[in-house]
Amino acid sequence: MDWPDADNHFTAGIQRLTRIHVGAPDHFRIGDKRFFDHPWIYATQVGWWGLSDEEVRLLREYLLRGGFLVVDDFWGAEQWEVFRETMRRVLPESDMTEVSESDSIMHVLYDIRDKDRTIIP
């Protein structure tokens, strides 16, 4: 399992490549008292999420307050669908949309092309 090493390497890269002060990694679950103290959250293995109704409510509140969620570590269509269904519970009024290669966000620091995206079936 890559946790917590992958998380730590990811946040170290953010610190190294941007002007964002990341601070020390802080691992916790949704609902932990520290949850709303972080404006940016990196969640891994969300294809295994089984969020309770309370966790769904808290994640919704977090996002609607302006919190930023980055997710990672999907293995195939089944895990993607688990995450998608979870997010439908969190934000039922919103749809997920794919970010195209031409979107400016794909070219802020690096030029990310479709060929660079990693998808594991």
Stretches found by the model and what they are:
Residues 26, 30, 57-59, 85, ...:
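Generic preference for flexible, low-structure residues
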Residues 78-121:
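An acidic, glycine-rich "communication" segment
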Residues 20-30, 71-76, 94-102:
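Surface-exposed patches in mature extracellular/periplasmic domains of secreted proteins
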